[in-house]
């Protein structure tokens, strides 16, 4: 059983293009929780961004959830949003 970690850093990101995805994935690698707003992207780009980020966080053992329309939270392995 994994212990829940508290007090980890959090980032809030608003990607403006698909090219911003790599920077967000680097936050995942540093075990940061990241809230991502995709409301400034067109629908097809927003879908691509969320698909790539969800695959990346899954590959790193973390998880994600939709908080509201166009807002997602990505948690590293061992961190649960409350």
Model-based region annotation:
Residues 12-15, 36-39, 75:
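Conserved beta-strand segments of the P-loop GTPase G domain that flank and frequently precede/overlap
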Residues 28-40:
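Short glycine-rich, basic-tinged beta-strand/loop micro-motifs
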Residues 17-24, 42-49, 56:
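Helical mechanochemical/support elements of P-loop NTPase systems and associated helical scaffolds
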Residues 49-61, 65-82:
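Short basic, glycine-rich beta-strand/loop surfaces that mediate nucleic-acid
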Residues 40-41, 70:
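Residue-level "edge-of-site" marker
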Residues 23-26, 72:
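Short capping/connector residues at structural and topological boundaries
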Residues 1-12:
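N-terminal leader/presequence segments that are low-structure
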Residues 3-4, 27, 31, 52-60:
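Conserved, well-folded catalytic cores of nucleic-acid-processing
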